Amino acid sequence: MKKFTILVIFLLVTFLFGCNISNQKLAKKMIEKYSDNRNYVTLTGEVIEFNENNVIIKCEELNDYLSYEDELCDYYIYSDQFVELQVGEEIQFTTVPFHFYNGHKLPIVELKIDENTLLSFEEGKENLLDWVNINFK
């Protein structure tokens, strides 16, 4: 029984250590991708659904970057301030069209409505990189 307990503890520690290494590798890839301004694209779309920082946008241009994604996509707005959007609004947004894991929402790091900037690129990018450093390291 004692050997079994030691084996279970060993396997649990090994599993947890493996998860930590996996997160560190993911964080490194995310930081590399999100740090390079060349990976960002600015798109235009229509707000379909909005809840706090989560937004679903209809964007036909997204298919040019993600062939497997349909024109409706989930995004997360990386703003420290509440951004008010209305369903049906036409918005211009900057994102990195790349999914790192299943369920990952594409980041919005810049947001404009009629040339009115609601989230600047610099602020949004900084918030996104901070989020990666906090959640994946």
Which residues are covered by each model-predicted region?
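Positively charged n-region of N-terminal signal peptides that target proteins for export
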Residues: 1-5
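Structural detector for short beta-strands of small beta-barrel domains
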Residues: 34-57, 61
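OB-fold/S1-family single-stranded nucleic acid-binding modules
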Residues: 97-134
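A short macromolecule-binding patch
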Residues: 63-78
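C-terminal motif of bacterial Sec signal peptides marking the signal peptidase cleavage site
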Residues: 15-18
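Solvent-exposed coil/turn segments that connect beta secondary-structure elements
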Residues: 60-62, 96-98
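Short nucleic-acid-contacting surface segments enriched for D/E, G, S/T with interspersed K/R
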Residues: 79-94
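Short boundary/loop segments of OB/S1/cold-shock single-stranded nucleic-acid-binding domains
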Residues: 21-40
